[in-house]
Amino acid sequence: MKKRKLATFYMAIAIVLVFIINVALGGGNRFWIFLTGGGYVKDYGEASFKLVLEQGQWWRFLTCGYLHMGVFHLVGNMAALEMIGTRVERKLGPVKMLVIYNLGTMLTAFLWCLVFPEGWTIGASLGIFVLLGMLCVMLFSKGGKGLTELSRYERGYLVFYVIAGCFLGIGTIVGHLIGFVIGILVGFAIIKMHLQGRTG
């Protein structure tokens, strides 16, 4: 395994371990927690307007990005993280990728809670869509030629990943859209700084 992929790999391992711990600790029928979510860890890690903005449990803006509603939610997000995260890590390095993912997750969760004050949110897609938006800017900044960096399978899966999220409710759609827009803005900012560095 190449060093440039280690941050994405270890972050995925951490997310999977959180899922396993959540299932093991229970908080309900473990089989259904495995399939559809729930559990003690989810209850202590999800983000909502009331828990974070009213009760001051700010860590939830970060922990919510490491929790999932069942194994299918987990697998879908980890496949996307591997494809997107590794490429962002190659372009920016492991530290910047991790910072952008985690801060992006927190900002996306914060804005989501403002839009849906009665709801709660979890899922790595909060940060993944930030990385996706940023990666799209970087790839299209090459006149579209950057898309060749993705295999046909990867392009197909990412299209499926985006479309599938649209069938999971308005909350998911809004969360993905917020993250994607944040990622686009970050991508343009990085390109601008890169250009200034070359001309400065």
Model-derived features: positions:
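A detector for small-residue-rich transmembrane helices and their helix-helix packing motifs
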Residues: M1-G200
